[in-house]
Amino acid sequence: MNQNIEKRLFTSESVSEGHPDKICDQISDAILDEVLKQDKNAKVACEVFATTNYLLIGGQISSTAIVNYEQVARDVLKKNGYVDDAYGINANTCKIDIKIESQSPDIAQGVELSNDQIGAGDQGIMFGYATNESKTYLPLAITIAHELVYNATSQRKKGLFKWARPDMKSQVTIDYTNINNPKIDTILMSIQHDPNYNETEFKKYIKENIMNLVAKEFNLNTDFKVLINPTGRFVIGGPQGDTGLTGRKIIADTYGGYSRHGGGAFSGKDSTKVDRSAAYMCRYVAKNLVAAGLADKIEIQVSYAIGISQPISIFIETFNTHKVDLNTIYKAVYENFDFSVSSMIKTLDLKKPIFFKTSKYGHFGKKDLPWEKLDKIEVLKEYKKCS
């Protein structure tokens, strides 16, 4: 370990859409989207548990929508390749229990306020982050980690990745010793495979056609340390190898540990749940501030009380990278962004059924998501003139 004492190494991980926790996230968000297609004002909190050939769908949904929850779940399993008993869960035959109730009236009375205002669905703290170290304004490690499992899954679905099964994980260590010239130190991938496979050929394919390919996409080095299935064998995976649960990949969903996290998960929750809407809003604000050149890195924390529309607090951290006075950044935020629940929902168009696409490979960095838009850059640049 002493050999790394002079290095500055940071690591993030991601998982594929076939990972058991991500299966649950996808089902939760697929149900949310199906409900929102029929009822944009629905209140949804949907959780999923997955194990060997079994799913439990539970939570609270108050809506006029009529949705076949079981069919939605089976469709998600099919999309991820779970159609074979050998994989531990079969979309066509697995048992599914539904335990859905209505939202508590005690919570409902705090959400629907007068004057078209919406109260926060719960108390809590949320964070959003942006950095200029990548084109997506996300930290490098999590960006590469997502791309690795996305690429591997895409090749598996196209039939190019021999022996690969749906369950995969990636882990990327970035060497920041030279802060202006980061490089990849280590890539770890654990990829489920068929029992009868050629280990040497399998690992060679991963290194040459996934790891090296992704590294080159980011114009980074390919002489990194490589770890592939370190235990030597990964046949039993998916919900059979490890139970899945909605909301258990909150760090991979966000910034890979590079920024703080308030603890609240996203998937399966409608936008009155500030765990989701406020985290998206914080990302939107931070990204626009960084893109406007007010700082190289920005993290925003907000807090809410149940039943109250406006945030209790807003805190901004720039890690000493701000290009203008910190008070100027606060001024820019307060004058241009409204963190009330109803305003966040309107600004980010959060009543639309857009959430399934967030349930895999991160909730941030995808250009077509409304909280990734850069529509405040010009107005924010004006604050550089008055600092």
UniProtKB/Swiss-Prot annotation:
One of its GO terms (biological process) is S-adenosylmethionine biosynthetic process. Binds 2 divalent ions per subunit. Mg(2+) binds at residue 21. InterPro entries: ADOMET_SYNTHASE_CS (IPR022631), S-AdoMet_synt_C (IPR022630), S-AdoMet_synt_central (IPR022629), S-AdoMet_synt_N (IPR022628), S-AdoMet_synthetase (IPR002133), S-AdoMet_synthetase_sfam (IPR022636). K(+) binds at residue 47. One of its GO terms (molecular function) is magnesium ion binding. It comes from the Bacteria. One of its GO terms (cellular component) is cytoplasm. Its cofactor is Mg(2+); K(+). It is found in: Cytoplasm. L-methionine binds at residues 103, 242, 273. Gene3D superfamilies: 3.30.300.10. The keyword Magnesium applies. Pathway: Amino-acid biosynthesis; S-adenosyl-L-methionine biosynthesis; S-adenosyl-L-methionine from L-methionine: step 1/1. Homotetramer; dimer of dimers. Belongs to the AdoMet synthase family. Catalyzes the formation of S-adenosylmethionine (AdoMet) from methionine and ATP. The overall synthetic reaction is composed of two sequential steps, AdoMet formation and the subsequent tripolyphosphate hydrolysis which occurs prior to release of AdoMet from the enzyme. This is S-adenosylmethionine synthase.
